[in-house]
Amino acid sequence: MIETKPIPGLALPRHDHALVLFSGGQDSTTCLAWALERFAHVETIGFTYGQRHSVEMECRGRVRQVLAHMSGRSGADWGSRLGDDHVLDLGNALHHVGQSALTGRSPIEIGQGGLPTSFVPGRNLIFLTYAAALGWRRGLRRMVGGMCETDYSGYPDCRDDTIKAMQLALNTGMEAHFVLETPLMWLTKAETWALADSLGGPALVALIEEETHTCYLGDRSQRHPWGYGCGECPACSLRAEGWREWQTASSA
């Protein structure tokens, strides 16, 4: 009989433990709050890849610090559920592969085939693969991401079909039982603001407005009612329009 030994550092799989792809932006912060409401233990993962808006990595720490002292509207103590943060450095690989406006200095506009020049080919596929590899070792079987098909700027790796295909591929390739959660998949940006309010109330909304970062240009010099940003790029436009729609609906 062959004796089996545990793999050093390998945690037992837990489906009430989650790993959130956390960039420091509005969507991933909302997803982190969503996960903290639902799961007993939540860790976060972020990536540096030469992104133009690298200021988002600075926002991550501040957002986590505030969330660690917050509770949800349900009464859940988010601080007791918030676990380790992991940052993986992907170097300049995505810049060399993608040649995107998100990793370079070219204008952000609609390019060939109708895709924005900010599209980084394979980015979410790479992120999910690294996240699953980390989750496999740490026993985290719920992967939570802010991908959205409603306000997704035309990115094909944000589509629901893509995420379902990735879940199948990751589970097959790692012999695991990952569940890829995308709570924003069918929400408009206005509904994402409303979700944040339902999860953490005015305190979470204020945190998102003040500390999260969405602007593709990395602009933190201009403060708008909905947060910081250039106010012109597609990411700022989506965030601003969603905020206005949510405010209008809330006051009706």
Curated annotation (Swiss-Prot):
ATP binds at F22, S23, G24, G25, Q26, D27, S28, T29, T30, C31, L32. Gene3D superfamilies: HUPs (3.40.50.620). Catalyzes the ATP-dependent conversion of 7-carboxy-7-deazaguanine (CDG) to 7-cyano-7-deazaguanine (preQ(0)). This is 7-cyano-7-deazaguanine synthase. Keywords: ATP-binding, Ligase, Metal-binding, Nucleotide-binding, Queuosine biosynthesis, Zinc. Binds 1 zinc ion per subunit. Pathway: Purine metabolism; 7-cyano-7-deazaguanine biosynthesis. HAMAP family: QueC. InterPro entries: QueC (IPR018317), Rossmann-like_a/b/a_fold (IPR014729). Belongs to the QueC family. The keyword ATP-binding applies. Zn(2+) binds at C215, C230, C233, C236. It catalyses: 7-carboxy-7-deazaguanine + NH4(+) + ATP = 7-cyano-7-deazaguanine + ADP + phosphate + H2O + H(+). Its EC number is 6.3.4.20. GO terms for biological process: queuosine biosynthetic process. One of its GO terms (molecular function) is zinc ion binding. Its cofactor is Zn(2+).
